[in-house]
């Protein structure tokens, strides 16, 4: 069975680069009816935090990237790592090394001074040193000294490294803790991982890991090293570019569907198709069409996709996110129009759910603030009389007539005729009175969504506060 994994370290938050790796791994497993597993690589006890673990899990949950088994934690597997280390030592594939820090520092200085390749020189490789109580020692892996380490990378093609370029790496530190390159191999063997999809910053680790797989007589998985994501300026993606906790995108009003759609196309293609549902991603995704070159993060493209999903999604698919932002903004959705009706009207005017909430607040909150510039421009000495006439005309409408935007628009137009002024002399002041600003959807739709009670009370307030009468 095809089995992939995502293995973040909880030393920082989950950012878009990690999310894309997780997405590619998840999609490949789903495409092949396989399994997707999640492993938390938390062996760096000094830098790993529970807050970072929680952020990773929150991000994966928000995006809908569900793992198929219980989460693996490396800190719960130390006994297993030590078991395998003892096995390698017993088989002559690893050895104890008691070289002092001073000796290793001198070795490195000598190598650098003579333009030699830096690395351990194998002094303890064939020695018969056995640690005694109180000794300071490490355990090193006996890397092959001849030949090549080669693999057919699913993204980068054939890669070969001479074993002469690799030294005998440490697999257990002086404090007894196992090292990263060793742990991940044991984990991937035990988890039966068949395909490792990860960032290409791991390419240099791969030959070391392949040699450990072979030493353990284990099947070597397929590797797919995905190029990094660059900022819009071509520099390494940083916080100023968008390399922030993925949950910040939620706070900024992006939909998970938009994030996933954007990231799947960031370095992977399927013809000219830009819009992908989750099901379409699963059906189409493969490793062959991952681009071997880095991709640049494009905020405008992400906003365009987010706008698309706000406009085109079934409301039930985005309801949770919309309600989240309204609650965060302190708006009571029971005190206004149905959210589905609101989104249908406002979607064309916004790129994010934060914008949607901010631009829609007057529908749900009576605490509107008048835009001074709009008031100064559109509210005149005769506006009070117009507002009074509007009140009369709106009060005369039956309840069901408030459900028809055209009827409400016609009331505004007929009021303009009655007052012998142009439509703009009525519509703009009315818009300011009921929304606080000179911008809103079509006046008939705005009136319908607000409803009779709100419109009348806000007109009465405007007469008192804006018209001094």
Swiss-Prot record:
Binding residues for Zn(2+): 97, 99, 124, 126
UniProt entry keywords in alphabetical sequence: Aminoacyl-tRNA synthetase, ATP-binding, Cytoplasm, Ligase, Metal-binding, Nucleotide-binding, Protein biosynthesis, Zinc
Cofactor note: Binds 1 zinc ion per subunit.
Function: Catalyzes the attachment of glutamate to tRNA(Glu) in a two-step reaction: glutamate is first activated by ATP to form Glu-AMP and then transferred to the acceptor end of tRNA(Glu).
Cofactor: Zn(2+)
Assigned protein family: Belongs to the class-I aminoacyl-tRNA synthetase family. Glutamate--tRNA ligase type 1 subfamily.
Biological process annotations from GO: glutamyl-tRNA aminoacylation
Pfam families with a match to the protein in the record: Anticodon_2, tRNA-synt_1c
Quaternary assembly: Monomer.
Record protein name field: Glutamate--tRNA ligase
InterPro entries in alphabetical order: aa-tRNA-synth_I_cd-bd, aa-tRNA-synth_I_codon-bd_sub2, aa-tRNA-synth_I_CS, aa_tRNA-synth_I_cd-bd_sf, Glu-tRNA-ligase_bac/mito, Glu/Gln-tRNA-synth, Glu/Gln-tRNA-synth_Ib_cat-dom, GluQ/Sye
Reaction(s) this enzyme catalyzes, per UniProt: tRNA(Glu) + L-glutamate + ATP = L-glutamyl-tRNA(Glu) + AMP + diphosphate
Molecular function GO labels: ATP binding; glutamate-tRNA ligase activity; tRNA binding; zinc ion binding
Source species of the chain: Francisella philomiragia subsp. philomiragia (strain ATCC 25017 / CCUG 19701 / FSC 153 / O#319-036)
GO (cellular component) term, any one: cytosol
Compartment annotation: Cytoplasm
Gene responsible for this protein: gltX
Motif ('HIGH' region): 8-18
The protein's Enzyme Commission number: 6.1.1.17
Signal peptide feature range: none
Span of the annotated motif 'KMSKS' region: 236-240
Residues at which ATP binds: 239
Enzymatic class: ligase
Lineage: Bacteria, Pseudomonadati, Pseudomonadota, Gammaproteobacteria, Thiotrichales
């Amino acid at each position: 069975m095809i089995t992939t994994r995502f293995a973040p370290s909880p030393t920082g938050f989950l950012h878009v680069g990690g999310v894309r790796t997780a997405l590619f791994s998840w999609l490949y497993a789903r495409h092949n009816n396989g399994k997707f597993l999640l492993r938390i690589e938390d062996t760096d006890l000094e830098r790993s935090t529970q807050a970072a673990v929680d952020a990773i899990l929150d991000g994966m949950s928000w995006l809908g990237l569900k793992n198929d088994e219980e989460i693996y934690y490396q800190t719960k597997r130390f006994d297993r790592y030590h078991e395998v280390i003892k096995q390698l030592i017993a088989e002559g594939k690893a050895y104890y090394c008691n070289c002092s820090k001073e000796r290793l520092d001198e070795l490195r200085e000598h190598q650098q001074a003579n333009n030699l390749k830096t690395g351990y020189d194998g002094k303890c490789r064939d020695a018969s040193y056995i640690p005694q109580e109180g000794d300071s020692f490490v355990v090193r892996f006996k890397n092959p000294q001849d030949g090549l380490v080669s693999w057919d990378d699913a993204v980068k093609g054939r890669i070969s490294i001479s074993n002469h370029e690799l030294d005998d790496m440490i697999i257990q530190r002086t404090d007894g803790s196992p090292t990263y390159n060793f742990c991940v191999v044991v984990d991937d063997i035990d988890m039966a991982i068949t395909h490792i999809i990860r960032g290409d910053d791991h390419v240099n680790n791969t030959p070391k890991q392949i040699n450990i797989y072979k030493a353990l007589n284990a099947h070597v998985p397929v590797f797919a090293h995905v190029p990094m994501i660059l900022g819009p300026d071509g520099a390494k993606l940083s916080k100023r570019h968008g390399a922030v906790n993925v949950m910040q995108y939620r706070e900024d009003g992006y939909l998970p569907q938009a994030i996933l759609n954007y990231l799947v196309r960031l370095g992977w293609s399927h013809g000219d198709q830009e819009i992908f549902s989750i099901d379409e991603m699963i059906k189409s995704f493969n490793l062959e069409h991952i681009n071997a070159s880095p991709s640049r993060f494009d905020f405008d493209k992400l906003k365009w996709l987010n706008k698309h999903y706000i406009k085109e999604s079934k409301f039930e698919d985005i309801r949770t996110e919309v309600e989240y932002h309204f609650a965060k903004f302190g708006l009571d959705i029971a005190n206004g129009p149905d959210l589905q009706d609101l989104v249908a009207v406002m979607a064309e005017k916004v790129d994010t759910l934060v914008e949607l909430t901010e631009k829609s607040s007057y529908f749900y909150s009576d605490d509107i603030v008048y835009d001074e510039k709009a008031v100064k421009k559109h509210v005149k000495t005769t506006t009070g009389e117009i507002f009074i006439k509007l009140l009369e005309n709106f009060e005369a409408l039956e309840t069901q007539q408030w459900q028809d935007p055209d009827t409400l628009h016609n009331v505004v137009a007929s009021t303009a005729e009655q007052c012998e002024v142009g439509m703009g002399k009525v519509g703009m002041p009315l818009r300011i009175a009921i929304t606080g600003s000179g911008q809103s959807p079509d006046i008939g739709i705005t009136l319908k969504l607000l409803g009779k009670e709100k419109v009348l009370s806000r007109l009465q307030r405007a007469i008192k506060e804006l018209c001094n009468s």
